[in-house]
């Protein structure tokens, strides 16, 4: 792991401990620590993704946050900006790396504990830290950060 990825992992963990959900912790880390330009209005989109989309245990909120960061850096504002064929491979590749690293992208598979218990918070804290590290390495590798 690089110094940058370790820094991102620690910051994401601290954000989670301070009350951000998993998705918010990832996005807040990369917007504050890495300068990813996500404004407050866009940041609020993260709030519903915690607990695998509102505690549905579906798509991991940390994974959703990673897709938001990647899309902010590589995405488009208008269809004429660039074809989706340039963007989808980035998010698909990260999805595959996430699944390989953690065994699944589903919150229910990654987090077997009851929400808001000590075990849940400890498990998610560790996961958010590792996910932020994985994203940092990926962004560096793909040269997506300025």
Which role does the model predict for each range below?
Residues 33-44, 72-90:
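Phosphate-handling active-site elements
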Residues 1-3, 30-48, 101-109:
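Acidic-glycine-rich active-site phosphate/pyrophosphate-binding loop
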Residues 1-18:
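Polybasic, low-complexity association/targeting segments
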Residues 48-57:
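Transmembrane alpha-helix interface/packing and boundary motifs in multi-pass membrane proteins
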Residues 56-65:
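Conserved phosphate/anionic-ligand binding catalytic regions in large, soluble enzymes, centered on
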